[in-house]
């Protein structure tokens, strides 16, 4: 058998292990945990009572963890075996990590959700409406938390006339559930009294899933569902969705977001009020103008009934009669003129007048011919068409004409006409 080099044997081990252990799930205790702040990668060992194996959790997978990885924690890791040939080391490259018994917790939560769903805890018809202008709001949180400070700041900016009352509550760890339940019951006890709260907001900032898991407890769900006061759940960040979010009347992604959702904006309402004021002024001006026009109409009506106005109306009627008389006179004269023109036309078409007219036209033509002869040059000729004198420029191609002077008379046809 040929000897293998160290590199060759490590390469073969790498190929064998990585092909064989593509997916492994290993449970153990976290030890030697190191989290690099710059890269975001985590390195640790997983151990039990007899053995240890190194693990890596790269930044992309580390950011997906639903809890904070801690030294000494019992976890189950899911990943693949990887080998580093230069040192002959092998390790688990982790894809997912869950706390020990996390699977059983998830199953229990799903069963609880189904139980509450059947009881109507998630039904929209059981949700209370959000108050439009809250005057007094109970904030269930830790009075020393950043969440409480942020909520106060945003509330003062948006709706400073609202009173926020912090009910100091334990928001994580042992005793958290009981503390939250008691605070909800206390705030709701003011319902329908002079000091009643318009809303109850259960709020805390982000954290690991272990820190937030208390808000998946059935006792908190019962307290929110039984409350007669409108309730909001504002736990963790946008990506954190807990049972309290589903049971409360309304969910907010963060404590600050709860104030933005619950409280109206004073600036927006100031703008709306300014708009209402302008509309009111316009409406008043329009109404005032309408009333003024109506009064002027009434005054005019009264004036028409006065004696002076009656006299004025009679004068107008007399003027109208004068105009009508003038129009009738003009119409009569037009009729007379038309009649005279008709008689004149009839006379002009009588046989006697027609004969005299024809005779007059013949004499006029003879006179024109004689006048033309007087102007003829020595070798010239008089041009006529149909016994009518005609100028050369009036002739057209094809016209039949007569030429005559003292010595002769001739007929001709026009072949062309050239005008100067």
Curated annotation (Swiss-Prot):
Gene3D superfamilies associated with the record: 2.40.50.1010
UniProt EC number: 3.1.11.6
Alphabetical keyword list: Cytoplasm, Exonuclease, Hydrolase, Nuclease
Presence of keyword Nuclease: yes
Location(s), subcellular: Cytoplasm
Signal peptide positions on this chain: none
Any Pfam family matching the protein: Exonuc_VII_L
Keyword Transmembrane appears in the UniProt entry: no
Catalytic activity annotation: Exonucleolytic cleavage in either 5'- to 3'- or 3'- to 5'-direction to yield nucleoside 5'-phosphates
Record's GO cellular component terms: cytoplasm; exodeoxyribonuclease VII complex
Any one Gene Ontology molecular-function term assigned to this protein's record: exodeoxyribonuclease VII activity
Top-rank taxon, per record: Bacteria
GO biological process, one term: DNA catabolic process
Self-association state and partner proteins as the record states: Heterooligomer composed of large and small subunits.
NCBIfam families listed in its UniProt record: xseA
HAMAP family per the UniProt record, alphabetical: Exonuc_7_L (MF_00378)
Similarity comment: family membership: Belongs to the XseA family.
Role according to the record: Bidirectionally degrades single-stranded DNA into large acid-insoluble oligonucleotides, which are then degraded further into small acid-soluble oligonucleotides.
Record-given protein name: Exodeoxyribonuclease 7 large subunit
Species in which this protein is naturally found: Helicobacter acinonychis (strain Sheeba)
């Amino acid at each position: 058998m040929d000897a293998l080099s160290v590199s060759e044997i490590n390469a073969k081990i790498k190929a064998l292990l990585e092909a064989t252990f593509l997916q492994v799930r290993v449970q153990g205790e976290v030890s030697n945990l190191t989290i690099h702040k710059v890269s975001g990668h985590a390195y640790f060992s997983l151990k039990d009572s007899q053995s240890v194996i190194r693990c890596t959790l790269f930044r992309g997978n580390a950011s997906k963890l639903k809890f904070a990885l801690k030294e000494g924690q019992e976890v189950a890791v899911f990943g693949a075996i990887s080998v580093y040939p230069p040192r002959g080391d092998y390790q688990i490259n982790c894809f997912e990590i869950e706390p020990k018994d996390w699977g059983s917790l998830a199953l229990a939560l799903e069963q609880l959700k189904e139980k509450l769903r059947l009881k109507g805890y998630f039904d929209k018809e059981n949700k209370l409406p959000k108050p439009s202008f809250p005057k007094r709001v109970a904030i269930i949180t830790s009075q020393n938390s950043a969440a409480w400070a942020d909520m106060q700041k945003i509330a003062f900016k948006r709706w400073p006339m609202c009173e926020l009352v912090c009910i100091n509550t334990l928001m994580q760890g042992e005793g958290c559930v009981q503390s939250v339940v008691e605070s909800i019951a206390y705030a709701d006890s003011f319902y329908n009294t002079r000091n009643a709260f318009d809303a109850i907001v259960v709020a805390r900032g982000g954290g690991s899933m272990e820190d937030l898991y208390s808000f998946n407890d059935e006792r908190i769900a019962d307290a929110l569902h039984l409350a007669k006061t409108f309730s909001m759940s504002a736990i963790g960040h946008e990506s954190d969705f807990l049972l309290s979010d589903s049971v409360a009347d309304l969910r907010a992604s963060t404590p600050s977001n709860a104030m933005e959702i619950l409280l109206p904006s004073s600036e927006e309402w100031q703008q709306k009020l300014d708009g209402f004021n302008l509309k009111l002024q316009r409406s008043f001006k329009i109404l005032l103008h309408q009333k003024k026009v109506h009064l002027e109409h009434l005054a005019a009506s009264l004036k028409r009934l006065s004696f002076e106005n009656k006299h004025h109306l009679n004068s107008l009627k007399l003027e109208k009669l004068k105009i009508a008389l003038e129009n009738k006179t003009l119409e009569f004269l037009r009729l007379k003129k038309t009649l005279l023109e008709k008689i004149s036309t009839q006379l002009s078409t009588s046989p006697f007048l027609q004969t005299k007219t024809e005779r007059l036209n013949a004499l006029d033509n003879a006179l024109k011919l004689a006048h033309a002869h007087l102007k003829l040059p020595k070798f010239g000729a008089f041009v006529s068409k149909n016994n009518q004198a005609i100028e050369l420029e009036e002739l057209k191609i094809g016209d039949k004409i007569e030429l005559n002077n003292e010595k002769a008379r001739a007929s001709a046809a026009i072949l062309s006409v050239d005008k100067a």
